[in-house]
């Protein structure tokens, strides 16, 4: 017996409807109401027989949507939602609009066990991993609130996606097949967990038939010593081993790897850091995405100066490294990962 309908494919819903003693077309109706119409509860699916809806509700079956608890909208229209789960946990998701696209930043866990020193989410530890349908529900919540169809999804919210690979891949299948978001418009970001990058490549090819989503690996330092200072779990994952696993992923999937590098003022933003980073990733089929630090309260790190940011980028460009600078969004509304939830709990 399933408890949440969201996250199921059309064929799964058809088979389930038949197993419930209903005709297969009831499954197709469910699929339409779940994904196209975005229904929030069973009673809202008025095309289904009333008696069946009541029976399902009595059996504990639900749509599987999340409940909005707080909303913040910044001056640039970036929208952050604090969402509640059925078991009383809270998580964050962010809608980032431009003229041409709407990107949804989703969480893969409630909290995070990685404890990166510069990250608000890591301050509270891990509560649990999210189910696949809870990830999909975040995208539907942003679509509902912003009244726009999401075009891109990035797994850059709360949690470490590679500690929840099965649910992440389940959600990617659903986002692609049921919500029509192409895999090439989906990015999975990881700080790096030993042995999981090869597993991600292998499972994606096995379960999805292809691995066309973008893999973004968070480096945040040009050497092992500094990386261990910023990311405690890096002590168990040497830099060279991480890059070897990235090469495996590249060779297995044929997809270029993106390297994320958060610039922390006076910590890892010096030109010699940029030169050292170029030594690491030069010749690697990759792209470096620079991110200026988004300050959180009661934290020792600071946002680097514009001069430092541009200087870092110029060093990489001169070394032939493909590089871009991510625009900061929602700075006035606690839009960095974990800030809203942390402030709500404090």
UniProtKB/Swiss-Prot annotation:
InterPro entries: Aldolase_TIM, Methyltransferase_A, RlmN_N, RNA_MTrfase_RlmN, rRNA_lsu_MTrfase_RlmN/Cfr, rSAM. The active site is at residues 92, 337. One of its GO terms (molecular function) is 4 iron, 4 sulfur cluster binding. Disulfide bonds join 105-337. Binds 1 [4Fe-4S] cluster. The cluster is coordinated with 3 cysteines and an exchangeable S-adenosyl-L-methionine. Keywords: 4Fe-4S, Cytoplasm, Disulfide bond, Iron, Iron-sulfur, Metal-binding, Methyltransferase, rRNA processing, S-adenosyl-L-methionine, Transferase, tRNA processing. It catalyses: adenosine(2503) in 23S rRNA + 2 reduced [2Fe-2S]-[ferredoxin] + 2 S-adenosyl-L-methionine = 2-methyladenosine(2503) in 23S rRNA + 5'-deoxyadenosine + L-methionine + 2 oxidized [2Fe-2S]-[ferredoxin] + S-adenosyl-L-homocysteine; adenosine(37) in tRNA + 2 reduced [2Fe-2S]-[ferredoxin] + 2 S-adenosyl-L-methionine = 2-methyladenosine(37) in tRNA + 5'-deoxyadenosine + L-methionine + 2 oxidized [2Fe-2S]-[ferredoxin] + S-adenosyl-L-homocysteine. Its EC number is 2.1.1.192. It comes from the Bacteria. GO terms for biological process: rRNA base methylation; tRNA methylation. Its cofactor is [4Fe-4S] cluster. GO terms for cellular component: cytoplasm. It is an enzyme of class 2 (transferase). Residues 98-332 form the Radical SAM core domain. Pfam families: Radical_SAM, RlmN_N. The keyword Cytoplasm applies. S-adenosyl-L-methionine binds at residues 159-160, 189, 218-220, 294. Gene3D superfamilies: 1.10.150.530, Aldolase class I (3.20.20.70). [4Fe-4S] cluster binds at residues 112, 116, 119. Specifically methylates position 2 of adenine 2503 in 23S rRNA and position 2 of adenine 37 in tRNAs. PANTHER family: 23S RRNA METHYLTRANSFERASE, RADICAL SAM CORE DOMAIN-CONTAINING PROTEIN. HAMAP family: RNA_methyltr_RlmN (MF_01849). Belongs to the radical SAM superfamily. RlmN family. This is Probable dual-specificity RNA methyltransferase RlmN. It comes from Synechococcus sp. (strain CC9311). The gene is rlmN.
